[in-house]
Every structure is written in C-alpha cells, then in structure tokens.
C-alpha cells in the first residue's frame, strides 16, 4: 500500500515541516517549502470522498515539483466546503499569521474547488485566485439558474462565505477559466465584479476545462503563469489553440450546436475536425 506524497514530505524523517489536520468531513494538510509562495488548493468532485489511503490534495505533485509551499483542503464528499469547523479553522490560520508569512499566496481549484478558492481568498489579502469553471454560490435564492449539483445545493448555504461575490474586495487578481457556451458557468463569471478579473474563455472545453487543458499538456504552464500572476489573455488563447484537435472539444461543440437547433452544421464541423487531425498526423 502506497502513502500520499504529502506524507513523504512531512513524516518524521521528511524533508519539510508541516501538518495534517482532520476536521470531520474535511481535512487540511500543510507543507512548508518556499518561504515566498504559498499555494492553497481545494478538492473538486473527482477527488472529494476518495477512500484510498494514498490521497493527495489537488495539484500536490505540480506544486511540489515547483518547490512551492502548499496548503491542501480535502473534502469527504460534495460539500462545497460548507462546514463551520473548516471555516473556523481556516480563519484561525489567518489569525495565527500563516498567510501573512508569505509574500505571495495563490488559491486554486476547479468547479467545486474553484468555489472554495474564491470563497476563502479574502483570508489572504492580495492573493491571486486561479479558478477553473467556478461556481459563485449554489444558494438557490441567489442562483436559481444553476441546478446541476443537487448534492451541493443541499449543503448549508447560510454559513459564512457562501456567496463569493461578497468577499472579493481584498483579493488581488482572479483568473477565471470557463466555457462561455456553458450557460451556468458564464452566468457565474458574470456575477464576479472585480477590477482585476481576468476572464479566460475556453470555448468548447466544457465544464471540465482543467481536465481538457491537462490532456493538451497546457494545464501546468497555464497554472504556473497564473500563480505567478504573469499569465495574459493572449498567452492563454495561444496555449488553448490546440483544443480544436481534442475529441472532447468536438463532442462539446456538436452538443452545443444540437441543443441550439443547428444540428445541420454538425456533419460539416465533424468533417473539418477529422481533416484537421489527419493533417496534423500526416
């Protein structure tokens, strides 16, 4: 049986200081590496509730490979981090000065994890958020148009930080990657009013934008630039050009056309896709 990467770093003979804290249906682990850069990541639905023992927080290996310090937030299910114990614990970390210790703090996640990154970013004033296909809330009195995640909707949305748009004034910069063809994702981004919002339209990538970028071997480069605060929209769109050769892109666009009564355009689009891929492989 293997052990998680974070444990190898902070077990008694490990190279770094750190901790692991279990909090009911959540857990937090911390690895202290680079004194200048802390990255805080949040589970998404793919990882949340995983029962295997060798479980790492989202992007653990990527962050370790870059030598950055890491605070990883685990979820035991589709909780959307609506848990008073977790909220209090992260607030206490702020009060103890953990986030203030670092010159640069970035928070990152995808879907549910992106909500977490946006919801808690204000605990580290001046921080950067890297959010892939985020929700801003699942409170149905605020966002009745997003009913995709019924287990998330059942969480306690009366808890603090349940509408991220109310807590962004101290955040430094927000990179938001989303597919504008996914109506709910687009509407969540439209709710974010921030002077340093960098909207990154990932047309055809669908809700699982981070997964598709990983298949394109672009996710690490995009995340690295965003965490450092150097990523530009033009660079993102340049790196996203190869999406037109990814099968998920083709299927997402075909679904989009069909849903809008334009299925007559699907055969032509599919032929163009196949010709483009054949030309690349020739």
Protein language model annotation of sequence segments:
Residues 122-124:
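Alpha-helix C-terminal capping segments
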Residues 109-119:
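Glycine-rich nucleophile elbow surrounding the catalytic serine of serine-hydrolase chemistry
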Residues 1-103, 126-282:
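Extended, composition-driven regions rather than compact fold-specific motifs
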